[in-house]
Design a protein with these regions (language model features):
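Structural detector for helix-capping/boundary residues
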Residues: 34, 48, 61, 105-108
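Active-site-adjacent beta-strand/loop module that shapes the phosphate/pyrophosphate-binding cleft
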Residues: 69-91, 103, 107, 124-128
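Short connector loops at helix/strand junctions that flank enzyme active sites
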Residues: 4, 31, 76-78
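Conserved N-terminal beta-strand and adjoining loop/helix that marks the start
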Residues: 1-18, 66
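A short coil-to-beta-strand element that immediately follows conserved catalytic motifs
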Residues: 56-65
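Conserved Nudix-box catalytic region and its N-terminal flanking loop in Nudix hydrolases
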Residues: 13-52, 56
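Nudix hydrolase/Nudix homology domain
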Residues: 27-29, 96-130
Length: 130
């Protein structure tokens, strides 16, 4: 079976909002994420993807989840990290040209927006409660 591994960054600002992105081919929002490149650690992938998709520099605080699933016959492993914004400014610089919007979403917005990965909502809400 073919395998794919990626990383996702959960970044919460001082207003208790989560940084989310929307891609042109999705009806929903998701945390910044993407595939691990050759020679890259999951942590390095997370930092790179957040920068590319949102413009923000982040540092990894801790790994908080690993999601394993099968999508269209591909074994998918996604590493989730809690990250902290340390610099940069908002601006999408996605080399894949997939991300069309990045925004901070509040707790009330998280409960009402469409999610690209609805199964992640519980994890996001848990992170806001910490």
């Amino acid at each position: 079976m073919e395998r794919w591994s990626g990383s996702a960054g959960i970044c919460i600002n001082e207003k208790m909002e989560i940084l989310m992105v929307k891609s042109f081919d999705s009806q929903g929002w998701a945390v910044p994420s993407g595939g691990i490149e050759e020679g890259e650690t999951p942590e390095e992938c997370c930092v790179r993807e957040v920068k590319e998709e949102t413009g923000y520099d982040v540092k990894v605080i801790e790994q908080i989840n690993v999601k394993r699933t099968i999508i269209k016959g591909i074994q998918v492993t996604t590493y989730y990290f809690r990250v902290e914004k340390i610099g940069g400014s908002s601006g999408i610089n996605d080399p894949d040209k997939i991300i069309v919007e990045a925004d901070w979403k509040s707790l009330s917005e998280l409960k009402t927006i469409d999610h690209a990965y609805p199964e992640d909502l519980e994890l996001l809400l848990e992170q806001l409660e910490q």
